[in-house]
């Protein structure tokens, strides 16, 4: 395990799913449980950003010493507000950024992206499609959240020092946004 923070955003409404996806069953827990567990195989601490149903997540994870919970009251204004809420809690020179609905990221993916670290941002792609986790230096992260007139984190990072890297693991682009996505992902990545 490396001394590195990982921001995991879990604040959204899951509106396309039709139900709250963070607590959908996955392996022996939930999608979010598995996303956190997988990140902690490589990272030393999770900065979990909550919003919608934040009290439930606080109750579930508050007693875990390697999870810092940040509530984003502005979560309805978009993902960028969640990252901005988390940044003051970052204590390491680099940090990963990912989402709570990415339960298939493995330690090997984190390790591979970590090995490419530099003073900017490492933006992983799979077949040209942007994915996660993103790795970013703390100075680069601070600059990104202060950029005016940006609507998302990737856009803010693209305006600074960044390196796009092709990764062969399709898991970095796995999106669980709809019921069909969930069924397909469970069939492909879990033992039912």
Curated annotation (Swiss-Prot):
Protein transport keyword on record: no
Catalytic activity: Mo-molybdopterin + CTP + H(+) = Mo-molybdopterin cytosine dinucleotide + diphosphate
Domain of life where this protein originates: Bacteria
Names of required cofactors: Mg(2+); Mn(2+)
Enzyme class: transferase
Domain notes: The N-terminal domain determines nucleotide recognition and specific binding, while the C-terminal domain determines the specific binding to the target protein. When the N-terminal domain of MobA is fused to the C-terminal domain of MocA, comparable kinetic constants as wild-type MobA are obtained with GTP, and the activity with CTP is completely lost. Consistent results are obtained when the N-terminal domain of MocA is fused to the C-terminal domain of MobA: the kinetic constants with CTP are comparable with the ones found for wild-type MocA, although no activity with GTP is detected.
Alphabetized PANTHER family for the sequence: MOLYBDENUM COFACTOR CYTIDYLYLTRANSFERASE
Cofactor comment: Mg(2+) is essential for activity. However, Mn(2+) is able to functionally replace Mg(2+) with a 50% reduced efficiency, whereas no MCD is produced with other divalent cations like Co(2+) or Ni(2+).
Role played: Transfers a CMP moiety from CTP to Mo-molybdopterin (Mo-MPT) cofactor (Moco or molybdenum cofactor) to form Mo-molybdopterin cytosine dinucleotide (Mo-MCD) cofactor. Is specific for CTP; other nucleotides such as ATP and GTP cannot be utilized. Is also able to convert MPT to MCD in the absence of molybdate, however, with only one catalytic turnover.
Protein name: Molybdenum cofactor cytidylyltransferase
Source organism: Escherichia coli (strain K12)
Pfam families: NTP_transf_3
């Amino acid at each position: 395990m490396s001394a590195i923070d990982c921001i995991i955003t879990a604040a959204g409404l899951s509106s396309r799913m039709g139900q709250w996806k963070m607590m959908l069953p996955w392996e022996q827990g939930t999608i979010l449980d598995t996303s956190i567990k997988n990140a902690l195989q490589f990272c030393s601490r999770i900065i979990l950003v909550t919003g919608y149903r934040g009290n439930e997540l606080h109750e579930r994870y508050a007693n875990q010493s390697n999870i810092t919970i940040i509530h984003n009251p502005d979560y309805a204004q978009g993902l960028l507000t969640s990252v901005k809420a988390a940044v003051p809690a970052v204590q390491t020179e680099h940090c990963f950024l990912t989402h709570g609905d990415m339960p298939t990221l493995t330690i090997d993916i984190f390790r591979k992206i970590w090995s490419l670290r530099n003073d900017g941002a490492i933006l992983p792609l799979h077949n040209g499609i942007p994915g996660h986790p993103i790795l970013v230096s703390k100075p680069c992260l601070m600059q990104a959240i202060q950029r005016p007139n940006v609507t998302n984190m990737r856009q803010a990072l693209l305006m600074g020092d960044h390196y796009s890297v092709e990764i062969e693991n399709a898991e970095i682009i796995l999106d669980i946004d709809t019921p069909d996505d969930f069924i397909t992902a469970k069939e492909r990545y879990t033992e039912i």
